[in-house]
Amino acid sequence: MTCGACAKFHRDILPKIKEKYVDSGQLRLEFRDFPLDIWALRAAAMARGAPAKRYAALLEVLYRQQTRWTSADDILAALKQIGRLAGLSPAYVQACLKNGELLDGIANSRLQGNREFGIASTPSFLIGDRKIDGYLPWPEFDALLADAVG
Protein backbone atom coordinates (compact mmCIF):
# COMPACT_ATOMS: atom_id res chain seq x y z
CA MET A 1 0.00 0.00 0.00
CA THR A 2 2.99 2.31 0.37
CA CYS A 3 4.78 1.15 -2.79
CA GLY A 4 4.78 3.84 -5.49
CA ALA A 5 5.15 1.30 -8.30
CA CYS A 6 2.17 -0.61 -6.91
CA ALA A 7 0.07 2.56 -7.00
CA LYS A 8 1.17 3.18 -10.59
CA PHE A 9 0.21 -0.40 -11.52
CA HIS A 10 -3.14 -0.06 -9.78
CA ARG A 11 -3.85 3.25 -11.50
CA ASP A 12 -2.46 2.63 -15.02
CA ILE A 13 -2.33 -1.12 -15.70
CA LEU A 14 -4.97 -2.83 -13.57
CA PRO A 15 -7.98 -1.22 -15.31
CA LYS A 16 -6.65 -2.44 -18.67
CA ILE A 17 -6.16 -5.98 -17.32
CA LYS A 18 -9.68 -6.00 -15.93
CA GLU A 19 -11.19 -4.72 -19.15
CA LYS A 20 -9.29 -6.98 -21.53
CA TYR A 21 -8.81 -10.19 -19.56
CA VAL A 22 -10.87 -10.38 -16.38
CA ASP A 23 -14.20 -9.03 -17.62
CA SER A 24 -13.99 -11.37 -20.61
CA GLY A 25 -13.42 -14.35 -18.30
CA GLN A 26 -9.95 -15.16 -19.64
CA LEU A 27 -8.13 -14.51 -16.36
CA ARG A 28 -8.83 -14.33 -12.66
CA LEU A 29 -7.11 -11.82 -10.40
CA GLU A 30 -6.04 -12.61 -6.87
CA PHE A 31 -4.55 -9.91 -4.67
CA ARG A 32 -2.24 -10.91 -1.86
CA ASP A 33 -0.92 -8.44 0.63
CA PHE A 34 2.84 -8.04 0.88
CA PRO A 35 3.37 -5.11 3.27
CA LEU A 36 6.93 -3.84 3.38
CA ASP A 37 6.44 -1.48 6.32
CA ILE A 38 4.13 -0.88 9.27
CA TRP A 39 1.96 1.63 7.40
CA ALA A 40 1.46 -0.72 4.47
CA LEU A 41 0.43 -3.37 7.00
CA ARG A 42 -2.04 -1.00 8.65
CA ALA A 43 -3.50 0.18 5.35
CA ALA A 44 -3.90 -3.45 4.26
CA ALA A 45 -5.63 -4.21 7.57
CA MET A 46 -8.06 -1.36 7.02
CA ALA A 47 -8.84 -2.59 3.50
CA ARG A 48 -9.11 -6.26 4.47
CA GLY A 49 -11.17 -5.42 7.54
CA ALA A 50 -13.69 -3.42 5.54
CA PRO A 51 -16.89 -5.04 4.28
CA ALA A 52 -16.18 -7.00 1.08
CA LYS A 53 -18.31 -4.66 -1.03
CA ARG A 54 -16.06 -1.74 -0.04
CA TYR A 55 -12.69 -3.45 -0.48
CA ALA A 56 -12.04 -2.53 -4.14
CA ALA A 57 -13.13 1.08 -3.67
CA LEU A 58 -10.99 1.40 -0.56
CA LEU A 59 -7.95 0.06 -2.42
CA GLU A 60 -8.63 2.57 -5.16
CA VAL A 61 -8.65 5.47 -2.70
CA LEU A 62 -5.58 4.21 -0.82
CA TYR A 63 -3.55 4.00 -4.01
CA ARG A 64 -4.84 7.23 -5.56
CA GLN A 65 -4.21 9.15 -2.34
CA GLN A 66 -1.00 7.28 -1.49
CA THR A 67 1.35 10.26 -1.64
CA ARG A 68 -0.98 12.31 0.54
CA TRP A 69 -1.51 9.79 3.34
CA THR A 70 2.01 8.33 3.38
CA SER A 71 3.54 11.79 3.75
CA ALA A 72 1.02 13.11 6.27
CA ASP A 73 2.26 14.35 9.63
CA ASP A 74 -0.26 11.98 11.24
CA ILE A 75 -0.54 8.91 9.03
CA LEU A 76 -3.02 7.23 11.35
CA ALA A 77 -5.38 10.21 11.12
CA ALA A 78 -4.95 10.23 7.34
CA LEU A 79 -5.89 6.53 7.17
CA LYS A 80 -8.95 7.18 9.32
CA GLN A 81 -9.95 10.00 6.96
CA ILE A 82 -9.69 7.64 3.98
CA GLY A 83 -11.75 5.12 5.92
CA ARG A 84 -14.39 7.80 6.52
CA LEU A 85 -14.48 8.54 2.79
CA ALA A 86 -15.15 4.84 2.23
CA GLY A 87 -17.99 4.89 4.76
CA LEU A 88 -16.09 3.42 7.70
CA SER A 89 -16.30 5.05 11.11
CA PRO A 90 -13.04 6.04 12.84
CA ALA A 91 -13.83 3.45 15.54
CA TYR A 92 -14.24 0.75 12.90
CA VAL A 93 -10.92 1.68 11.27
CA GLN A 94 -9.23 1.70 14.69
CA ALA A 95 -10.62 -1.77 15.40
CA CYS A 96 -9.20 -3.04 12.08
CA LEU A 97 -5.81 -1.53 12.85
CA LYS A 98 -5.71 -3.24 16.25
CA ASN A 99 -7.10 -6.61 15.14
CA GLY A 100 -4.21 -8.95 15.93
CA GLU A 101 -5.67 -11.87 14.00
CA LEU A 102 -6.11 -9.71 10.90
CA LEU A 103 -2.63 -8.19 11.18
CA ASP A 104 -1.06 -11.62 11.74
CA GLY A 105 -2.91 -13.02 8.72
CA ILE A 106 -1.59 -10.24 6.50
CA ALA A 107 1.96 -10.67 7.82
CA ASN A 108 1.71 -14.42 7.28
CA SER A 109 0.54 -13.82 3.71
CA ARG A 110 3.75 -11.91 3.11
CA LEU A 111 5.84 -14.72 4.60
CA GLN A 112 3.99 -17.30 2.51
CA GLY A 113 4.57 -15.30 -0.67
CA ASN A 114 8.26 -15.17 0.09
CA ARG A 115 8.54 -18.81 1.06
CA GLU A 116 6.40 -20.35 -1.70
CA PHE A 117 7.14 -18.06 -4.61
CA GLY A 118 10.35 -16.23 -3.73
CA ILE A 119 8.60 -12.87 -3.65
CA ALA A 120 10.81 -10.29 -1.99
CA SER A 121 9.62 -6.98 -3.44
CA THR A 122 6.57 -5.18 -4.71
CA PRO A 123 4.93 -5.20 -7.06
CA SER A 124 5.32 -8.85 -7.95
CA PHE A 125 3.06 -10.94 -10.11
CA LEU A 126 2.46 -14.63 -10.69
CA ILE A 127 1.24 -15.37 -14.18
CA GLY A 128 0.78 -19.10 -14.37
CA ASP A 129 4.01 -20.50 -13.00
CA ARG A 130 6.03 -17.43 -13.96
CA LYS A 131 7.03 -14.78 -11.43
CA ILE A 132 7.40 -11.17 -12.57
CA ASP A 133 9.16 -8.70 -10.28
CA GLY A 134 8.57 -5.00 -10.62
CA TYR A 135 6.41 -2.68 -12.65
CA LEU A 136 6.02 -3.36 -16.36
CA PRO A 137 4.58 -0.98 -18.94
CA TRP A 138 1.25 -2.05 -20.43
CA PRO A 139 2.60 -3.40 -23.76
CA GLU A 140 4.96 -5.78 -21.92
CA PHE A 141 2.34 -6.82 -19.38
CA ASP A 142 -0.24 -7.31 -22.11
CA ALA A 143 2.15 -9.54 -24.08
CA LEU A 144 2.77 -11.73 -21.01
CA LEU A 145 -0.95 -12.06 -20.34
CA ALA A 146 -1.77 -12.74 -23.99
CA ASP A 147 0.83 -15.50 -23.99
CA ALA A 148 -0.59 -16.94 -20.76
CA VAL A 149 -4.13 -17.21 -22.11
CA GLY A 150 -2.87 -18.62 -25.39
Task: Report each predicted region and the residues it spans.
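Short pre-active-site segment immediately N-terminal to redox-active cysteine/selenocysteine motifs
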Residues: 1-2, 121
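Structural alpha/beta surface segment adjacent to cysteine/selenocysteine redox centers
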Residues: 2-84
